[in-house]
Design a protein with these regions (language model features):
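Conserved beta-strand-loop-alpha-helix hinge in the C-terminal portion
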Residues: 176-199
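C-terminal substrate-recognition "lid" of short-chain dehydrogenase/reductases
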Residues: 156-158, 174
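Active-site phosphate/pyrophosphate- and oxyanion-stabilizing loops and adjacent acidic/basic residues
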Residues: 168
Length: 200
């Protein structure tokens, strides 16, 4: 293991894992970082980088060029799409699907059975560069659906079973089992056709 660079998960092709030779599994960001733990059934495609000090459950799948940074915990049966960035110190539950070009900043929490559409952007800094502040990403509770090109502002909570429509800019909490639409997002009743848990 080099002080800053490549390390490797033990026996990367064992335990029914498929890891492309152009993927980096175990990027050592400090001299004493620990190689990642990845469960059975993983498929990690070319260009993906997974840092040390990451814990991932079974049946993990990436697209091409995904990034998972340090101190991230990911549950079972999770998809991280092509060019999606998970910027570390983040907790993601099980049965989660993140599509292409999603950005997840540090200090974000994602529950179980959550869908995140392409090019969704989560944020954790309310005053970029201009003020010093604690970074706080959004919290997505269980069974949340996030549409394409949604922006979630720092520290907001999207409640259980809520649905955020494509293109919405969410500046405040979204109550459970509601629909958020528009810029800035307005809260509306959730249509019956969209109610119920996600089957991911």
């Amino acid at each position: 293991v080099s002080p800053l660079g490549w390390s490797a998960v033990t026996e990367p092709q064992s335990r029914d894992r498929t890891i492309h030779p152009d993927a980096t599994v175990g990027y050592a960001y400090t001299a004493d970082s620990t190689p990642p733990t990845i469960g059975d059934g993983a498929t990690i495609r070319s260009g993906t980088v997974i840092y040390d000090d990451v814990t991932i459950g079974s049946d993990f799948t990436t697209g091409h060029g995904a990034l998972v940074r340090e101190k991230t915990t990911i549950g079972d049966d999770v998809i991280v799409g092509t060019n999606t960035v998970i910027d570390g110190q983040t907790t993601i539950g099980s049965h989660v699907s993140m599509q292409t070009n999603v950005y997840v900043p540090t200090n974000t929490t994602v529950g179980n059975r959550v869908f995140v559409g392409p090019a969704a952007t989560f944020t954790n800094d309310p005053y970029p560069i201009r003020q010093s502040t604690d970074l706080e990403g959004p919290t997505l509770e269980d069974d949340v659906s996030i549409g394409a090109n949604v922006t979630l502002l720092p520290g907001i909570t999207v409640g259980e079973g809520a649905f955020v429509a494509a293109g919405a800019v969410v500046t405040d909490d979204v109550p459970p089992e509601t629909l958020a639409v528009g810029t800035p997002a307005e809260i509306r009743p959730l249509p019956e056709s969209l109610s119920g848990g996600n089957d991911i």
